[in-house]
């Protein structure tokens, strides 16, 4: 009983002491040993949100790369009867017995594709003079070349059967119209979603080039579903029927994660479970839901977005949160707790899309709230941030790799909290480089700048240290309003992928184990009132690692980081630190296919067309990408 009384008394004294130290700051409270509330439990909100953003970005890069393909030769298969190319009608005759005939007037059927000026520029060459049948045929061929240059390969000019009398001649035009448009095999995608994006309307002039472009674009930007178009002669003369065949994967995915990227005060070891969908309500709307768990923290999250236009503009809602309690360390008796939330309503819109270049815009309205409670007298501090942000995201493919760049402008409005009134500028860059022979380089960098020396809620500060930033240090040990981060990593095979046994080649460990060497560096600069150590601003480390594909669907990233700079914020100093992440992502689609009793239909093999001299896709083999992100842990 006496021990319990002494313990409670000690808690009360420590709590009152903490309150006294909090008077001069509405957020940070220090004891004589330099203890900060936000760095122990409050920062879990920022720490976990940052980790989720890192995962989201890695997943974006992975999906973007894996979906990048050159146009398939059979994206559009033409099964209609083909014309021989001879548009001369042998029934054309002339009254004169000579080899030439006078043409005074040429009548051409109305066209929805070619303008009168374009047609007149061709037929004017044979009007008002004697011409041969060959010259008339040449004019017809010129019109067909004009059709071909526009991509309308189903349109053609021809000479109908006629007798040339009085110098008058008629050139006929056939401009095929779209007939019936049907979609097959789309269990998880609405028919209207597909037909809205192939751009072919019934009774409109059929454009095969536009159709192929639409099909390739659809396959490029819609994960888990691909289209193939078959063309057939329409049931109505002068029309082309389009049959869209859909191949879909099961749209729901499960991912389990375990790592040691948690904070020491709430538990280094974390577990997580995530469910995400590629087409929740059959409109290619994406949903992610899940949570991370550690000894002292729970971090649930939810994200949902839906396409709102044919150019893949998306509106979405994001919710992330952290409920944390300090359970480890010298200050666990203070009963420190934190509750953090972030709500975002966002809109993303591709602005430019080319095979080797993409520019996207992103805008969002955010509401963030964080509350820290401690002590048995329930003392608390609360921060609220209402903000708006706008960003541009760029992807540029080069001969040996890909660039990703981001630039964001952010403003916090003083609506709910007068202190929250500031601008924030941030950006990032990533370079993936293929050195060939299985050697891949990855460069990453980001920065954040908040002008002035005002108090900034920790929810909008930048932090560094740990698995996703500077390896070799504890997770999230540094935080400040300004900062930067740089990392370089080289990923390479450490063993051969195949070995020869006798006359046969067998798979070897190089297929499942990759080596890695890295160097990380960061600088974090807090405002002067929060600069406890006045100069301990930098982190730097080097290290090595392994990326392993375990049997089944289990993958892992293992790193050993060695600090090069002794940082005073690092209370648990180690010469080297081990980081790991294990991810279990079962391929549900493959499992369902194994259980399926449906008859497997073998498609007729179509001979591929020769590749162009300068193929757009520099990475047709997606295994290149596995060297970068062979851990599919990013579910967002």
Where on the chain are the PLM-derived regions?
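Gram-negative bacterial Sec-dependent N-terminal signal peptides
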Residues: 2-27
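Periplasmic polypeptide-binding modules associated with outer-membrane biogenesis and secretion
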Residues: 29-262, 274, 290-299, 445-447
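Gram-negative/organellar outer-membrane beta-barrel architecture
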Residues: 29-33, 191-192, 207-401, 563, ...
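Surface-exposed coil loops of outer-membrane beta-barrel proteins
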Residues: 190-200, 271, 325-332, 336-338, ...
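Transmembrane beta-barrel strands of outer-membrane/channel proteins
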Residues: 231, 256-260, 273, 289-293, ...
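Hydrophobic core residues within well-ordered beta-strands of beta-rich domains
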Residues: 271, 343, 359, 388, ...
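C-terminal outer-membrane beta-barrel translocator/porin domains of Gram-negative envelope proteins
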Residues: 373, 378-515, 519-521, 525-527, ...
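C-terminal structured "cap/appendage" subdomains that terminate the fold
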Residues: 535-556, 563-568
């Amino acid at each position: 009983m006496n021990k319990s009384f002494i313990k409670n008394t000690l808690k009360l004294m420590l709590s009152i002491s903490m309150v006294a130290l909090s008077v001069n700051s509405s957020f940070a409270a220090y004891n004589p040993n330099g203890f900060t509330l936000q760095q122990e439990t409050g920062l879990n909100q920022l720490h976990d949100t940052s980790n989720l953003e890192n995962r989201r970005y890695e997943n974006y890069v992975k999906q973007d790369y894996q979906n990048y393909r050159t146009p398939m030769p059979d994206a559009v298969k033409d099964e209609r009867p083909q014309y021989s190319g001879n548009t001369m009608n042998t029934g054309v005759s002339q009254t004169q017995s000579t080899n030439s005939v006078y043409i005074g007037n040429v009548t051409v059927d109305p066209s929805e594709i070619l303008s009168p000026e374009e047609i007149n520029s061709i037929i004017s060459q044979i009007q008002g003079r004697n011409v041969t049948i060959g010259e008339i045929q040449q004019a017809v061929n010129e019109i067909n070349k004009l059709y071909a240059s526009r991509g309308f390969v189903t349109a053609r000019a021809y000479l109908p059967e006629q007798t040339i009398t009085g110098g008058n001649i008629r050139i006929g035009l056939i401009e095929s119209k779209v007939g019936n448009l049907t979609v097959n095999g789309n269990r998880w995608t609405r028919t209207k979603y597909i037909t809205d994006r192939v751009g072919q309307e019934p009774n409109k002039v059929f454009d095969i080039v536009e159709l192929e472009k639409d099909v390739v674009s659809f396959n490029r930007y819609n994960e888990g579903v691909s289209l193939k178009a078959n063309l057939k002669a329409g049931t109505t003369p002068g029309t082309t029927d389009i049959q869209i065949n859909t191949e879909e994967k099961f749209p729901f995915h499960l991912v389990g994660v375990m790592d040691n990227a948690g904070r020491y005060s709430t538990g280094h070891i974390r577990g997580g479970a995530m469910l995400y969908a590629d087409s929740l309500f059959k409109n290619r709307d994406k949903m992610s839901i899940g949570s991370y768990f550690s000894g002292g923290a729970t971090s649930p999250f939810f994200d949902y977005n839906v396409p709102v236009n044919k150019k893949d503009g998306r509106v979405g809602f994001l919710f992330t949160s952290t409920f944390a309690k300090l359970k480890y360390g010298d200050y666990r008796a203070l009963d420190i707790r934190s509750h953090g939330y972030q709500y975002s309503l966002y809109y993303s819109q591709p602005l430019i899309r080319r095979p080797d270049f993409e520019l996207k815009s992103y805008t969002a309205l955010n509401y963030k709230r964080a509350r820290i409670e401690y002590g048995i007298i329930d003392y608390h501090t609360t921060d609220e941030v209402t903000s708006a942000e706008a960003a541009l995201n760029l992807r540029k493919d080069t001969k040996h790799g890909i660039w990703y760049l981001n630039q964001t402008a952010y403003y916090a409005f003083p609506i709910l909290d007068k202190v929250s009134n500031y601008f924030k500028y941030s950006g990032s860059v990533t370079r993936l480089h293929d050195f060939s022979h299985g050697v891949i380089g990855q460069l990453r960098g980001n920065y954040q700048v908040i002008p002035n020396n005002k108090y900034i809620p920790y929810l909008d500060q930048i932090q560094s240290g740990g698995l996703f930033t500077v390896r070799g240090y504890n997770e999230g040990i540094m935080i400040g309003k300004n900062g930067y981060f740089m990392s370089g990593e080289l990923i390479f095979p450490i063993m051969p992928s195949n070995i020869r046994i006798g006359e046969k080649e067998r798979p070897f460990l190089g297929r499942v184990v990759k080596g890695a060497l890295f160097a990380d560096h960061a600088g974090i600069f807090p405002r002067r009132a929060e600069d406890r150590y006045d100069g301990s601003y930098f982190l730097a480390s080097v290290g090595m690692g392994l990326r392993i594909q375990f049997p089944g669907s289990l993958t892992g990233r293992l790193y050993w980081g060695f600090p090069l700079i002794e940082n005073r914020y690092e209370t648990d100093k180690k010469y080297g630190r081990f980081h790991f992440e294990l991810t279990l992502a079962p391929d549900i689609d493959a499992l369902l296919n194994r259980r399926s009793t449906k008859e497997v239909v073998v498609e007729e093999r179509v001979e591929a067309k020769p590749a162009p001299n300068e193929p757009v896709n520099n990475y047709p083999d997606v295994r290149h990408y596995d060297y970068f992100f062979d851990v599919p842990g990013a579910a967002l």
